[in-house]
Regions:
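Intrinsically disordered, low-complexity regulatory regions in eukaryotic proteins
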Residues: 2-96
Length: 96
């Protein structure tokens, strides 16, 4: 089950459960749409995977399965970002 992390790992922007700006990779690294698509160019700096919009957990399920409140703010090193982008940005996600 997804944690539904509450913020962008790079810039720290709030991304509550209801946010349509949240993007995740297959390991649930969480970024805002601006960081994921503009800064990172759809390449996760941790795994090299792509990003997809994070699903919104229905309100009726939040009491039983609450979204995480743990802030994860780990701004990525520019060198690491560039290294991953150069390696993967021209390769379609299904071919990485």
């Amino acid at each position: 089950m997804l944690e539904i992390r509450p913020n962008c790992e790079h810039c720290g922007k709030d991304l509550p459960n209801s946010s349509t700006e949240a993007m995740i990779c297959s390991f649930e690294c969480t970024y805002c749409k601006d960081c994921a698509l503009d800064l990172l160019e759809n390449v996760c700096p941790s795994c090299g995977g792509n990003f997809q919009p994070r699903p919104i957990r229905p309100k009726v399920m939040l009491a039983k399965y609450p979204a995480s409140e743990k802030q994860v703010h780990l701004p990525k090193n520019k060198g690491k970002i560039e290294k991953m982008k150069v390696r993967y940005r021209l390769i379609k996600p299904e071919k990485r």
